[in-house]
Design a protein with these regions (language model features):
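Interfacial segments of alpha-helical transmembrane regions
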Residues: 44-63
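Hydrophobic core of alpha-helical transmembrane segments in multi-pass integral membrane proteins
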Residues: 37-45
Length: 179
């Protein structure tokens, strides 16, 4: 019971009003909770004194953010409001990464409320006319997949080697992953 209360208070403590006068409360929630959920995951991990888990959380956050930004620039999909870089939703991928970590590392007691909060982040992005549902779904799937590979699959950057390859007109990347 104490853990659920701590999780709820932590997630919603990041939703206090700031200088977002032109935005709806739902949009402000999405803006803040994209950071609040992963920060809450870090707080829970610290309470558990789980060093390995903290590394998995940090690595998942890094790879999720990097992959999201690479896709945004590469795809450059138009937003519903006419802006660019709609695909995938960065807010949703950030929130979902924290939720996925909590689910895979500590189970449903933490994972379900965190995923519920992440779904609201995704909903806020669609309601704010910033994303289509496909952008939100892709952000959630991307973050969940990356965090699964790290937390459950044991895949880590410490097991990955990337070396650029240049030979005349040929350019490439040598990649090696040990399991």
């Amino acid at each position: 019971m104490k853990f659920r209360l701590l999780l709820t208070i932590s997630i919603f403590s990041f939703t206090s009003p700031m200088s977002y006068a032109a935005k709806s409360k739902l949009e402000v929630y999405g803006d803040i909770a994209q950071y609040g959920i992963p920060l809450t995951a870090g707080l829970i991990t610290a309470i558990h004194m789980d060093g390995e888990g903290m590394m998995q959380l940090a690595e998942g956050a890094f790879w999720t953010a990097a992959t999201t930004e690479i896709l945004k620039v590469s795809v450059d999909a138009q937003r519903p409001n006419g802006g660019t870089q709609s695909f995938p939703s960065g807010h949703t991928s950030a929130a979902s990464q924290g939720a996925a970590y909590l689910q895979f590392r500590y189970g449903s007691v933490y994972g379900i409320p965190a995923y519920a909060a992440a779904v609201v982040v995704g909903y806020s992005r669609v309601e704010a006319n910033k994303h289509y549902w496909r952008d939100v779904a892709a952000g959630m799937a991307l973050a969940t997949g990356i965090q699964y590979a790290i937390t459950v699959g044991g895949i880590s950057a410490t097991n990955l080697v990337l070396i650029p390859y240049f030979d005349g007109d040929e350019t490439g990347i040598y990649a090696s992953l040990s399991f």
